[in-house]
Amino acid sequence: MELRLFLFNRFDDPLGELAWGGRLTHAEEIGGEDTLEFECPDAPAKGDRLLWRDPDSGAWREHVVVRTDEPLRGACRVYAESSLSEMLLDFIEMAQLVSRTAEQALAAALAPTRWEAGTVEDGFGKHGCMLYHTNALAALRRIEEVWGCEAEPIVEVSGNRVSRRSVSLAARRGGWRG
């Protein structure tokens, strides 16, 4: 499957397909970074969104351009992070999670965001923690830690654009790749 990058501006308006060349590197760490690095002839703007279908899993992925290195001559180097990074701007004043399920905790963490709760596997039990003066992404990472689960962003596409963004919780995502 040929990897195609579809470019959208920060307001989710389509800008077309982004031409890229050379090597594209996708690095993902569970509960950590999820980045995309590549070179292209024309630099996308900071905040633009890249939508692509993962050739390994067939799942749609979305990344946000956070930096471009533009030399005087040659290709532009693009660095993008998972669209979950937008949750860094969503603030949680306070959420007391006392004897809550993972599903209830996820709903609290996603409340100030445009993301929805996806599928939550059974078996995480009831736990508690305090989410106080934090961002939604830090809250999501705390939920992973306390409930012993792994979060997975799910991007659904219809009509050549993102139709839904959700976060699912699983006991374990994918396999070990080193």
Language model features by range: what are they?
Residues 11-18, 53-60, 139-146:
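Short, solvent-exposed secondary-structure boundary motifs
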Residues 41-123, 128-129:
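Surface-exposed cap/loop segments at beta↔alpha junctions
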Residues 72-87, 119-178:
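Short beta-strand-centered interaction patches in the first periplasmic/extracellular domains
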Residues 3-5, 20-24, 115-122, 149-153:
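Generic structural motif
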Residues 16-21, 62-66, 91, 175-178:
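Short amphipathic beta-strand/extended segments with alternating polar/hydrophobic composition
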Residues 1-46, 81-85:
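Juxtamembrane "anchor/assembly" segments of surface/extracellular structural proteins
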Residues 22-28, 65-70, 153-155:
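Short amphipathic beta-strand and strand-loop transition segments with alternating hydrophobic
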Residues 7-13, 22, 35-41, 50-54, ...:
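N-terminal start-of-chain detector that recognizes signal peptides
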